[in-house]
């Protein structure tokens, strides 16, 4: 298995958090969520930050959290869905470790995101606006080292695919 961090990216509801926790357990690594880093540093929930200060303030906090992650090694990191899509951040993520895009079907990831609640990026947006956001982010996510299609798969299946992709990537580099 490759040394260094494994960084999970993808749209909200793609399974980054739940798959990241299981992946970290399977690899014997720590699990870190960028949103948790933001909450710990700021003292407010993500919805509170959005509501009180707006998205631009949240994106600044996200950039600070990303800088803090530069100190991490051999962890599994789950990013917020928008983190890779701003100000060269995908380049930073690629420097942190192997970036894995969890690519799911829009309807599927959106249904999961809505079920989980606390998604400020969904608030007040039409289905068309959310679809545009999803498709607008794909070009950023596509810069990942590895893409894992998650459509119709359960958590164990997704993690198995991530592990297989990481092994394959590591074998190709040795």
Say what each PLM segment does.
Residues 8:
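Hydrophobic anchor at the beta1->P-loop junction of P-loop NTPases
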Residues 11-14:
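P-loop (Walker A) phosphate-binding loop of NTP-binding proteins
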Residues 17:
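Walker A/P-loop
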Residues 95-139:
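A glycine- and Lys/Arg-enriched "phosphate-lid" helix/loop adjacent to the NTP-binding pocket
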């Amino acid at each position: 298995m490759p040394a260094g961090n494994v960084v999970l990216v993808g749209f909200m509801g793609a399974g980054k958090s739940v798959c990241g926790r299981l992946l970290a357990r399977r690899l014997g690594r720590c699990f870190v969520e960028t949103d948790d880093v933001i909450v710990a540093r700021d003292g407010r929930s993500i919805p509170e930050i959005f509501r009180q200060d707006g998205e631009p303030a949240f994106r600044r906090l996200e950039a600070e959290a990303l800088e803090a992650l530069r100190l991490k090694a051999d962890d599994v990191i789950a990013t917020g869905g928008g983190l890779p899509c701003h100000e060269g951040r995908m380049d930073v993520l690629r420097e942190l470790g192997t970036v894995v895009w969890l690519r799911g079907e829009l309807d599927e990831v959106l249904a999961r995101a809505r079920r989980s609640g606390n998604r400020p990026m969904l608030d007040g947006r039409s289905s068309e606006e959310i679809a545009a956001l999803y498709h607008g982010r794909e070009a950023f996510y596509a810069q990942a080292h590895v893409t894992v299609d998650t459509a119709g798969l359960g958590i164990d299946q997704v993690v198995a695919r991530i592990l297989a992709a990481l092994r394959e990537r590591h074998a190709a580099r040795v």
